[in-house]
UniProtKB/Swiss-Prot annotation, chain A:
Active site: 158 (proton donor/acceptor)
SUPFAM superfamilies: Arginase/deacetylase
Organism annotation: Oryza sativa subsp. japonica
Signal peptide limits: none
Compartments reported by the entry: Nucleus
Essential cofactor(s): Zn(2+)
Entry EC number(s): 3.5.1.98
The name this protein goes by in its record: Histone deacetylase 3
Listed GO biological process terms: epigenetic regulation of gene expression
Length: 510, 858
């Protein structure tokens, strides 16, 4: 990637306006193991949907390195989870297993582990995987090398500091936002899941550095929070917006309230980064949902946020009719890339889910829309009235951030001119460069780790070996070699291609 | 390390920042420091040169790399151990210092001269330091000296962990204040990190030490933990205050405390969960005791004890909310919120079957791939238990069913597991084959299920719509609706009008094909009524209250505005009779006509309100009687009417009313209004179909829809298939079309009311339709039957051509007889119809007798 793109990343900090026609640089985080976690028979939450989404992306050719960068995430370490969650809660999640849980009823109750949030095999590893992907995506946005970062396995917005809730154990969104706040003064969080994003809202309820906006079904519906009068508290007053909606809302009604509100929010708040939780249970036909959005209507929100050209983090969320979830998120990945995908689905190993039409589009039903125009107008006026009470963007100068952002660049150039050509290699290099050692020592470590990475990549590609599940730290070696189930040849080729492409610059002679 | 002295001074802060930002860099540095301290100089130089070579050979395998390094480190067991730890991703210093700390504590415990009380006191000091109750290292050293001061060798060994930290503290501060760091300062920075890690090792041991505590010690631990949590709250407040103070400082100064904070947190080990920990957890906050700030949030009491996080960053502490909690209700996994139809449930079952099948297949496949990888990488000298994830173990357990747990235990105990792995792998692959076959079976079954259920799963409206529509199509509802609807309508799509006419013509031709002439009349009649609707705007100009019928809101002048040519050319009425009908309709007898219409349909139930209406009509009847005095001369006719009325117990006046209603039964404004309304509804629905088809992707969906509708009318397709077609090609909003067949039936019925001469044949029509349907089912030679029908039509047309008026008179006579006999009248009616048929077959001579009789009567 040439230096000018780094400059473009810097421009995004200033919210430079760009046309929609311009391509966005997109990175996509996916762990091949995520689809194997199993909440239990009959449980609506199915991480398998993320694997289905990935298969669609592969067969549509979106995983090609020319289109977007595909990354396998580093699992979040326990310390990383404790940036938000309490020590005891994380310790319990790490220790509990289906066999040991029976003797810890009190702890299960305390941490709200139960039917909605069961203990299943690999629970802690699952949390590490999706949280690591969200934090990794936020880091990518901070680097300025990408405009949009995607993690469909994340978006678990109900988890609280010391308890699980609504199928969510670790709140990866809060962790990602904390990461974004290291660089950006203000971060906007938008939640279009049908359920209210209570965990994220609670975490940032008293601060003005994060604005939370949630569009959700309200009234005798989980989690029961999200009243329009919940507007934030203390320093966070008016930085929390709740848009309560009713059953059967359709595309036109939804956009008639989403676009005016978000336009005003972007104008008044001017966030440095946006996190959009794309829960797909607001689609028509969802097993647990009661809205009537079509796939195109749901993706219209993504398209709208993309048009602002602000660093954008796309996360998954709810979504319990998995044939609709996979198509929706595949379509939205295409929206992020600016790709027009053909309606007819390409054949893939999950093709039978999508009959009888085998169409990329999720159709709306004819259910009654209980949101009257009058009600929606009242809600909109109420929200816009709260927005008018905001101070017009906090008075912190952007210039103060620019020197800090640029500070690392000259040193990197001096130490290793090749780094600019391989940002991910930059991450790898940073991992092993000790301070105070000679250039020779630096070269030693670079060589050691790089050789290991390259060798493992080749092994995986040639023999389709499953990577051993080591501790969190060694996963740095796999950063450039995201992996797919070996049986899908197309997937394997598509997934490994980015790794190969990234290795080429590194292997060029100095 | 010496060579790094040449680095530019202004680069130091950023380097330090990046070092602290990334744990892997720190670990690499630790690794190199340890290796250098363990190895002789020449071996270390050799090591460094080998690293350079390895880097240059980019295609070297991992195993070969390790082989080279281990060869260099041969004879240095500690260095090899450090290298192994490094490869596995652990902190080399941490591991080494943990071992030393453990050794130290064990020897202190084993020393007979140190009492148990003193030993526990030592552990207590370390535990407090770990929980930040003792804040400074100086204090730790001071307390330790008091406890073991009498044993110099132990104290001296303990100082290995402490003195470096103390000595490094001052130079570290100096380096912070100075923008450029000297060579000596860098050395101290390195040692500082080393010292911190040593302390870290000690803390780990302190934690382990608590596990060995006596019951008394356990109680003390509980108290300490409680105090620790309280301190954590105070600590947080202190941190906030510190943050406020630090904010005004320069940016460069802000960076150091933050980075240092991160470093400290990274070094601390995570809390280990134990079952005893469960009892120490503070209870969850009871929202009912808290003050609500906004509807979903309550404010925590200030003294509230909540679970804390020791690893929050400065940023997190300043931003994250810990003073309010939201109050949730309900469960996300709850199905009651949305009514789903059975088709949707069928779709979900199919999806679940595919999902469960895929999960089994994918997990077994992942486990098999993992074991293959193990075999390839480690051969037979591997403790498999250490590498298996919980998911892999669960698969193996399921693989062997009841013996699964035994198999896992055997794996963990066995030294040589290569043969076991081979067996497991074989079984896994076999299982994968079975699951793959099951998946293929599902692939064949699912398409049918989803095809049959998908389109209907999108339909949530049609069941209730069908019920409502039946009620909406009743004459009462249509009339009420008609009054409320504005008559000024613009119907811009002439093609829809044509379609309405064509479809009704088709429907009528399907229902009765024995008489060609009436069919032709119906076609033109529909066109006439459809075109009449274009004139409704004109009607408004002439509408006045006095002239509006109170029941249907239609102007009584409606008939006057119908073009005479339309009625004259298309109806069998003579001009004289048309004039007569118009004159009669201007009277107020229309309301009574309405009542009779309802009686015929079996919907009319007499009540007080209706009787009052009848009473109000009496004076008008008198007036009409005097106007048309010529009727009073027919004594015989009047007498027969009176007889029939007496049977129902009516008075003489009611008898007159009834007689007059009979005369007007054939056509009334209400009947016309109902027909117009039905045609209007039909127009609107065909318009919906046309609009939906324009949005559909299929080309010319509207034409296909009309074909399908005709198939439904003639019985070649059923309602279910018709609805499926609409949902598939026109989308889920096409549910308003599902009742079109019933709507068309009502239109046909309503048309029959308007044409009096055909009224008696309504029963005949139904019989014909039933017979025809029966024949369609039994007789495949439909064209032949149509030919026969055509001949029959020609015959009847010829027969009627010679005596157009006589049949009408005959029918009137028959109808009179029917009324006088009640239920048995129906049987007589059939008898008369059969007699009529025989009369027709006999030819013109048979008509002369009844004809002459009627003339004499008139």
């Amino acid at each position: 990637m040439d230096p000018s793109s780094a400059g473009a990343g810097g421009n995004s900090l200033a919210s430079a306006s760009c046309g929609d026609a311009q391509k966005r640089r997109v990175c996509y985080f996916y762990d091949p193991e995520v689809g194997n976690y199993y909440y239990g028979q009959g449980h609506p939450m199915k991480p398998h949907r993320v694997r289905m989404t990935h298969a669609l992306l592969a067969h549509y050719g979106l995983l090609a390195p020319a289109k977007m960068e595909v990354l396998r995430p580093l699992p979040a370490r326990g310390i990383d989870l404790c940036r938000f969650h309490s020590d005891d809660y994380v310790a319990f999640l790490r220790a509990v297993t289906p066999e040991t849980q029976l003797g810890q009823v009190r702890a299960l109750r305390r941490f709200n582990i139960g039917p909605d949030c069961p203990v299943f095999d690999g629970l802690y590893a699952y949390c590490q995987t999706y949280a690591g992907a969200s934090v990794g995506a936020a880091v990518k946005l901070n680097h300025g090398t990408h405009d949009i970062a995607i993690n469909w396995s994340g978006g678990l917005h109900h988890a609280k500091k010391s308890e699980a809730s609504g199928f969510c154990y670790v709140n990866d969104i809060v962790l990602a936002i904390l990461e974004l706040l290291k660089l950006h003064e203000r971060v906007l969080y938008i939640d279009i899941d049908i359920h209210h994003g209570d965990g994220v809202e609670e975490a940032f309820y008293t601060t003005n550095r994060v604005m939370t906006v949630s569009f959700h079904k309200f009234g005798d519906y989980f989690p029961g929070t999200g009243d329009i009068r919940d507007i934030g508290y203390s320093e966070g007053k008016y930085y929390c917006l709740n848009v309560p909606l009713d059953d059967g809302i359709d595309d036109d009604s939804y956009q008639s309230i989403f676009k005016p509100i978000i336009s005003k929010v972007m104008e008044m708040y001017r966030p440095g980064a946006v996190v959009l939780q794309c829960g797909a249970d607001s689609l028509s036909g969802d097993r647990l949902g009661c809205f009537n959005l079509s796939g195109k209507g749901h993706a219209e929100c993504v398209k709208f946020m993309r048009s602002f050209n602000v660093p954008l983090l796309l996360l998954g969320g709810g979504g319990y009719t998995i044939r609709n979830v996979a198509r929706c998120w595949c379509y939205e990945t295409g929206v992020a890339l600016g790709e027009e995908l053909q309606e007819k689905l390409p054949y893939n190993e999950y093709y039978e889910y999508f009959g009888p039409e085998y169409s990329l589009y999720v159709a709306a039903s004819n259910m009654e829309n209980r949101n009257t125009n009058k009600q929606l107008e009242e809600i909109k006026c109420n929200i816009l009235d709260n927005l008018s009470k905001l101070q017009h963007a906090p008075s912190v100068q952007f210039q103060e951030r620019i020197p800090e952002t640029k500070l690392p660049e000259p040193d990197e150039d001096q130490e290793d001119p090749d780094e600019r050509h391989d940002p991910d290699s930059d991450m790898v290099l940073d991992d092993h460069k000790p301070t105070g050692h000679s250039a020779r020592s630096l070269i030693h470590n670079i060589g050691v780790k790089r050789e290991i990475t390259e060798t493992e990549t080749k092994d995986q590609h040639g023999k389709r070996l499953t990577t051993e599940h080591k501790g969190p730290e060694p996963m740095a070696e796999d950063l450039g070699s995201s992996k797919q189930a070996p049986t899908a040849d197309a997937n394997a080729v598509a997934v490994n291609a980015p790794g190969n492409a990234r290795n080429e610059p590194g292997s060029s002679p100095k | 390390m010496d060579s790094s002295a040449g680095d530019p001074g202004d680069g130091v802060p950023s380097k330090r920042a990046r070092t602290e930002r990334d744990p892997y860099r720190v670990e690499t540095m630790e690794f190199l420091v340890l290796v250098k301290s363990e190895l002789p100089d020449d071996v270390y130089s050799h090591f460094v040169r080998s690293m350079i070579k390895i880097r240059r050979q980019r295609n070297m395998s991992i195993e070969k790399c390790k082989e080279i390094i281990l060869e260099i480190l041969d004879g240095q067991p500690e260095a090899i151990q450090v290298f192994e730890h490094f490869i596995q991703g652990y902190s080399p210093c941490r591991a080494k210092m943990r071992s030393k700390a453990h050794n130290f504590v064990e020897r202190v415990k084993a020393c007979p001269d140190i009492s148990r009380e003193d030993f526990h006191a030592l552990l207590n000091v370390l535990a407090k330091y770990y929980k930040n109750e003792i804040k400074t290292s100086e204090e730790v050293l001071e307390k330790v000296e008091r406890i073991i001061g009498n044993y110099p060798e132990f104290l001296e060994e303990f100082k290995i962990f402490v003195p470096h930290h103390l000595r490094a503290h001052l130079p570290n501060e100096k380096s912070c204040t100075s923008p450029k760091s000297s060579r000596v300062s860098e050395t101290f920075v390195s040692f500082t990190l080393d010292a911190m890690n040593k302390l870290d090792g000690l803390r780990v041991k302190a934690t382990n030490g608590r596990n060995q505590a006596t019951p008394l010690k356990y109680t003390q631990d509980q108290n300490q933990n409680h105090e620790g949590r309280g301190y954590s709250l105070r600590h947080k407040q202190t941190k906030r205050t510190t943050g406020l103070i630090e904010n005004p400082r320069k940016q460069g100064d802000d960076k150091s405390p933050h980075a240092e904070d991160d470093e400290e947190h990274k070094a601390e080990p995570l809390l280990q969960w134990s079952t005893s920990r469960e009892n120490e957890l503070p209870l969850k906050v009871d929202p009912s005791n808290c003050k609500h700030c906004t509807p979903s949030y309550c404010l925590l009491p200030k003294n509230c004890v909540t679970l804390q996080s020791s690893y929050q960053t400065e940023l997190g502490r300043s931003i994250l909310n810990d003073s309010l909690v939201s109050v949730t209700s309900g469960r996300e996994d709850c199905y009651k919120f949305r009514t789903k139809n059975q088709y949707e449930e069928n779709m979900f079952k199919c999806e679940d079957d595919l999902f469960e099948s895929d999960m089994l297949l994918q997990r077994f496949r992942a486990t098999a791939d993992f074991i293959e990888d193990l075999q390839y990488r480690f051969g037979s000298n591997v403790k498999i238990q250490e590498h298996l994830t919980p998911l892999h173990k669960r698969c193996i357990e399921q693989l062997y069913d009841d013996s699964g747990i035994d198999m896992l235990d055997a794996l963990s105990e066995s030294e040589n597991t290569s043969s076991a792995l081979a067996v497991i792998l074989s079984r896994l692959n076999q299982k994968i084959g079975d699951f793959s076959e099951a998946r293929l079976s599902l692939n064949k079954m699912c398409p049918d299920t989803v095809a049959n259920n998908y389109y209907r799963s999108l339909d949530h409206c049609s069941p209730s719509f069908k019920q409502l529509d039946m009620e909406r199509m009743s004459p009462k509802a249509l009339l009420a609706e008609d009054k409320q609807i504005s008559r000024i309508k613009s119907h811009t799509d002439i093609h829809i009008h044509e379609d309405v006419g064509v479809i009704i013509n088709y429907a009528y031709s399907r229902s009765c094909s024995t008489e060609d002439k009436p069919m032709m009349n119906w076609t033109k009649l529909v066109k006439a009524f459809v075109s009449v609707k274009f004139q409704w705007p004109d009607l408004k100009d002439t509408v006045s209250r006095r002239n509006v019928c109170e029941h249907c809101g239609m102007s009584r002048d409606f008939l006057n505005n119908i073009p005479v040519a339309v009625l004259t050319n298309e109806f069998v009425f003579s001009s004289k009779e048309v004039e007569s009908l118009r004159a009669k309709s201007n009277e107020s007898t229309s309301s009574l006509d309405h009542f009779d219409a309802e009686v015929e349909e079996g919907e009319f139930i007499p009540d007080v309100e209706n009787i009052q209406l009848r009473v109000r009509c009496l004076p008008t009847n008198n007036s009409m009687h005097s106007t048309y005095g010529h009727w009073s001369g027919s004594e015989e006719h009047k007498s027969s009417r009176d007889d029939s009325n007496n049977e129902v117990g009516s008075s003489e006046y009611f008898g007159r009313t009834s007689k007059e209603c009979d005369a007007n039964r054939g056509i009334s404004c209400c009947t016309l209004a109902v027909l117009c309304r039905l045609l209007q509804v039909m127009y609107e629905r065909l318009l919906v179909a046309k609009n939906l088809s324009e949005g559909a992707s299929t080309h010319d969906s509207y034409a296909h829809f009309k074909e399908k509708l005709c198939s439904l009318i003639d019985g070649s397709t059923d309602n279910w298939n018709f609805e499926q077609h609409c949902l598939k090609f026109l989308g889920p909003n096409s549910y308003v079309l599902f009742t079109l067949d019933k709507l068309i039936d009502r239109v046909i019925k309503q048309i029959c009311k308007i044409y009096p001469s055909r009224e008696d044949s309504s029963v005949l029509q139904r019989q014909e339709r039933s017979r025809r349907t029966f024949n369609i089912l039994k007789d495949p030679a439909l064209p032949a039957r149509r030919t026969n029908s055509s001949k029959e039509l020609l015959h009847h047309q010829n027969a009627r051509g010679t005596s157009i008026e006589l049949p009408k008179q005959g029918r009137e006579e028959a109808k009179g007889g029917c009324e006088s006999h009640g239920d048995t009248g129906k049987m007589k009616q059939n008898h008369f119809q059969r007699r009529k048929k025989r009369a027709l077959e006999n030819g013109p001579p048979s008509f002369s007798q009844p004809g002459s009789g009627n003339q004499a009567h008139n």
